[in-house]
Amino acid sequence: MENMPYSQIQKGTFLIATPDIDSGFFFRGVILICEHNANGSFGLLINKSLDLELPEEIVNSEHLINPYISIRSGGPVQTNQMMLLHTSSQIQQQTLMITEGVYLGGDLQFLQDAITDQNGPHIHLCFGYSGWGAGQLEREFLDGHWFLHPAELRHVFYISPDKLWQHLLREMGGKYATLSMIPEDLSLN
């Protein structure tokens, strides 16, 4: 599978950081595009785990029995804001379907119910988001900072976040698969 053209940037696609982004927040980042229109773009960085302890009014750890809850850094914008990315279609009036089986949204009651359900939905608690103004993302794409790949539920929830960047490049094949073998720290090469 080849890299998609920038005209294919849309809700439900991944932005995959190219090796040109060699440091910083988006280094080896994978961003799920949640909205893209003439006014700009919004997405969630889904492959950077956060080690946070959530306030008890949000999550009472004694009641956390859902094994499918994870915490992610959604991006560098408004990092004190939490968004729910999940697999539940039960609250459609509160959510936006990003791609088949992947939803954005929900309220505190949904979260509290989900964490106490051993068979509950997969949920990424995303702190912050990634955003671009009108035309900004297209310029970054044309400058060689991003590859595009269609997002699927299995990518979002079933592949380890620290392996997702490499996994997607390998799926793309060819020169992209070769790029996936570049070590994170080039001094180790």
Swiss-Prot record:
A GO term from the CC aspect: cytosol
Name listed for the protein in its UniProt record: UPF0301 protein pc1755
Family to which this protein belongs: Belongs to the UPF0301 (AlgH) family.
Q: Which Pfam families match?
A: DUF179
Instruction: Please spell out the taxonomic lineage of the organism that makes this protein.
Output: Bacteria, Pseudomonadati, Chlamydiota, Chlamydiia, Parachlamydiales
Tell me the InterPro entries matching this sequence: AlgH-like (IPR003774)
